[in-house]
Amino acid sequence: MHFGIYGINQGAAADPEVAVGLAQLAEELGFDSLWTAGDLALPDPKPHPYAAAPATPVVHPALCLGALAEHTDHLLLVLGASEGCAQDALLWAKLGASLDHWSDGRGQLLLPPGFAADAGQGLEAEWLEALRSLWGSDVPAVEGRFHPLSNLQAAPRPIQGARLPLWVQGRSAVAVRTALQAGKGWLCPGEDLETVAEGMAMLAEEEARSERSSALGLLEVSVLAGALPSPEDLEAYEELGVDRLVLRLPPDRAQVLEAFLEDVAEAYFDDFLDEPEG
């Protein structure tokens, strides 16, 4: 199993020195990925217990990961897109491509839970088509209602080309379906073993109904943990088919965050860690 950390752009990690130190420590310990929250503003009051407090500082994810690309070598850098991202294909194509360009091919893009909510209207599908065209076509073009493209270029393109990895977040049938049809992976919110098992059962149902392009490869599943699972539960996650555990950074001081990463590595890595790629 792989391990990632979520929230490298918020809380105490909104301080650049803290974020760099945590990223380098995570890479040294064996984590494989940094995931950023895509929030541009936070709801007040908190909508659920695992949400960040309304006054939590949040640095723009693209700015954060662009800086961390310079200070890390192998970590995957997962850019959290904000709700409403499907309204602007050019912006998110540029942000994803720029991150991938600066990080030597380590960029990935995380679509928010609300992305697939109105998939039936065609906005999201056209947004994805526009990104793929801008990233991979010599002559980017989309004939569409929402994101028509013609007579433009948007260099630099991603090092990974049109298949810069996309993740879809959310525990809903439409989010799973979108991940299967267009994504590298699905980020499943998982408060506990029961909710993870329910999510994996939903994935199995959607896989039976959906046709996934062979060009996308096998779907990866990451769980965004609400709390640290027990080793027994983590073993059950593996048996269910989970590929990665993504852990939320607690909203604490730098020293506490460093200790958190070290405690996670000590608790899990000897028994569960797959070596990061690259």
Which positions does each model-derived feature cover?
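Active-site-adjacent structural elements that line small-molecule/cofactor binding pockets in enzymes
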Residues: 1-278
